[in-house]
Amino acid sequence: MSISSREESEGMTKSCDVGSLPFPGESDTFLEGATRYTAGIDDVSTELFEQEVARAFLDKLKAGIEIPAFPQFRDMNDMFLSALKGLEKMTEGYVETGTLTLKQGREMLPEVAVIRRNADRFHLEMGKPFQLRVCVTGPYTLASLFPYKNSQTYTQLGRVLSEVVEKNVFAVKQGEVVLVSVDEPLFGVVDDPLIDRGTDGREDLLAAWESIMGRVKKRDVETCIHLHRTTDELFWEVESLGVVESHVDDPLYEMKATRGWLERKDKLLKASVATTDFDRLIKEKLGLNATGDAVADIWKKIAKGILSPEMYLEDVGLMKKRLEDTVERFGVERVAMAGTECGLRGFPTYGSAIECLRRVSEATWQ
């Protein structure tokens, strides 16, 4: 199902999030449960894992997010690399010891398995089918942890990630996956000779992205790439890519050239309307007094309960203005979604993260 299809009563742009949240509980038991959940083991750890993932997903839905990502409490790199055979984790990073393949029983992301298993509950509580965003860490970002990588590293990672997305797309009457995002926060951030123009690495990375997103498109599900910088234009060449998103202050959202790219390549934007760097949010409140010590002092007061983290969140009006500016600049037909610029794992509390999502939803509906 396309995210651009909507009932007459719905808004033109749908709210979404990027995935991560602060974990409110005991992380060691939770992480143990994540590794055991899809193996069908029933114990305290898997019960906690299912409970926390289901609760957080429902909280996102109740906050008004129309296309919530699965709640991401685990490390975005380790949750994928730990599922692979043919790798050895060394002090300097991951070293390939053979052909990369998925470990038996690790094809399904446990977070997605929880959501599918609890689909009846979500449908009952919300009174309508849910839509889900599945995020996978991309081959470029994962390969950054390989000290001895070459262009074939992208190829191998692209192949196994294609298998992952294939196994994690589902559609049932209670809900369905409507968006798969390839998260590449490191792409374009630093100069990388391996992907210079004209290199095999550049072509192999493009082919890896195409492999992953092409597999998704065959399931009639929309695709997205999550970036932090868009100065390197390679991503525009992915034919199976549908939606582009980046950070609030990325030139992508300001440049006239972006509209040309969107129209020539027939792609959509996700408007990033909420800043997720909490240090930056504090500094914006402090203004001229935003020294490092002052920011650290605010964090201490939040931790002690003296200050509420919600007082540092951006207001609905600012989020709405960012969305309006993006729509005015590129046309409502090119802005499929609006949401946070990145994950909310760096927020001080779980509650402040959910409040941020509620404001994003309100800004989108207004």
Provide a role label for each language-model segment:
Residues 127-134, 146-281:
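Active-site loop segments of alpha/beta catalytic cores
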Residues 1-87, 154, 220-222, 326-328, ...:
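N-terminal basic, low-complexity leaders that serve as flexible interaction/assembly modules and, when applicable
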Residues 102-124, 200-220, 357-366:
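Alpha-helix-loop-beta-strand connector modules within alpha/beta enzyme cores
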Residues 14-26, 32, 39, 44, ...:
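Hydrophobic faces of well-ordered beta-strands that scaffold small-molecule active sites
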Residues 53-64, 111-128, 162-177, 256-264, ...:
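Short amphipathic alpha-helices and their capping/turn segments at secondary-structure boundaries
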Residues 85-170:
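Active-site-proximal, glycine-rich beta->alpha crossover segments in alpha/beta enzymes
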Residues 242-366:
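Catalytic-face loop-and-helix region of soluble metabolic enzyme cores
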Residues 41-46, 87-104, 145-158, 191-204, ...:
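Glycine-rich tight-turn/loop motif centered on a GG-T
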